[in-house]
Amino acid sequence: MTTAQPDAQPGAQPIADLGLKPGQLHLNPGVDDLYAHAIRLGEGVQAATGPLTVRTNKTGRSPKDRFIVEDDQTRETVWWEGFNQPISAEVFDRLLDKMVKYAEGRELFVQQVFAGTDAEHRIPVRMITEMAYHSLFIRNMFVRPTAEELQNFQAEWTVLNIPSFKADPAVDGTRTDTFILVNFSKKMIIAGGTQYAGENKKGIFGVLNYLLPAKGIMPMHCSANVGEDGDVALFFGLSGTGKTTLSADPGRKLIGDDEHGWTDTGVFNFEGGCYAKVINLSAEAEPAIYQTTRNYGTVLENVVLDESGTPDLDDGSLTENTRSAYPIEQIANIQPGSVGGIPKNVVFLTADAFGVLPPLSRLTPEQMMYQFISGFTAKIPGTEEGVTDPTPTFSTCFGAPFMPRHPGEYARLLAQKVEESGAKVWLVNTGWTGGKYGEGHRMSLNLTRLKSRDSHFADHCPPKQV
């Protein structure tokens, strides 16, 4: 059994404790090796411009196939409504045992990474995958340990993701042959049946969303950036509402594009990379993100290549949910360490598909609580399996599929943070104007960015009823 690649670092915790007996094991392989493995295994091809391009059997998340083990730890602490579906420990153990047996003799990839840039609050995670491209995605998206940290790496959480393993709903107690099961007592996530790489990061996001509130830390589905004067802004929103785009502002330094924690001293990124939606992306409107789609090391998910092998970002024939996964270092204007101070502005993004909401509104504390709990927006085509038209949705906390606790816990914690910090709260419409989707037009990026910049300086703007 091969246990190392040329650039691999020997971690202190391999995978024998799980009973896994792979035919070949790649521990912490680097970018060059993962390109070679992904191409050899037929997972993808290298675009003429450099990125690794892949196609997946599912082109979005599968929130209806996600389950949490109900046991003594979670029975009273998880909100068993909406997206939080219970499953028994026996079902989890049975599926894990079947996965371990299925993986025997197969080729596996392991990345040892951190979730979180704050050394005090991060968690070390062991990500075991069947696909080389998933391993590159994980390397891009999570925080990579130093060589010294790898020498003594001890994972607190483990993710085992084998897309070719499919559950039998009649036997295994799942909804379909796809499953994402979270076990807080065993500190483990197992997944099968889906190649969509976003499940890897969202699974751990859900773990942090459960763990951090108990420490007084507000976990957030938001992007964050910081101005020259140190003023931090947060952008809450569902997938496709503009979090990544607006946070990558040439005039401000990027902290992160999707997942953050708010402590008593500031904010920190949960990730080490970005996962940008790139359909119809242009170099003129979004030069920083566009450039990542041309870089070696980037993973392009479900992006079509033209005859010359160049990514065609305007082609949505596979899905509207085309994605670019890249290390945050590919963005030139980033905040060192991906941490910032106490936020001064909190922006709620909503992609109103009906042309009703105003472009910019300042919210009162009561309005903030209402908007955060209701989380009105529209699901954008492609971000979830089966969503082909914008659909009005009320996603609590701007991330209901990832929030294991009761929404009230998150709302009270956010209200406490906002009150203590004196941050201003805004509602910005990134959706349609002049009519609904298909009739009007979407707010231009430049206009939306100007609105969000205005919010940083509009101290004179009082809250208004919306």
From Swiss-Prot:
Domain of life, per lineage: Bacteria
Signal peptide: none
Pfam families: PEPCK_ATP
Cofactor annotation comment: Binds 1 Mn(2+) ion per subunit.
Residues given in the record as ATP binding sites: 202, 221, 237-245, 286, 323, 448
GO terms assigned for molecular function: ATP binding; metal ion binding; phosphoenolpyruvate carboxykinase (ATP) activity
Pathway it works in: Carbohydrate biosynthesis; gluconeogenesis
EC number, as in UniProt: 4.1.1.49
GO annotation, cellular component aspect: cytosol
Record's catalysed reaction(s): oxaloacetate + ATP = phosphoenolpyruvate + ADP + CO2
Family to which this protein belongs: Belongs to the phosphoenolpyruvate carboxykinase (ATP) family.
NCBIfam families: pckA (TIGR00224), PRK09344.1-2 (NF006820), PRK09344.1-3 (NF006821)
Record protein name field: Phosphoenolpyruvate carboxykinase (ATP)
Organism: Deinococcus radiodurans (strain ATCC 13939 / DSM 20539 / JCM 16871 / CCUG 27074 / LMG 4051 / NBRC 15346 / NCIMB 9279 / VKM B-1422 / R1)
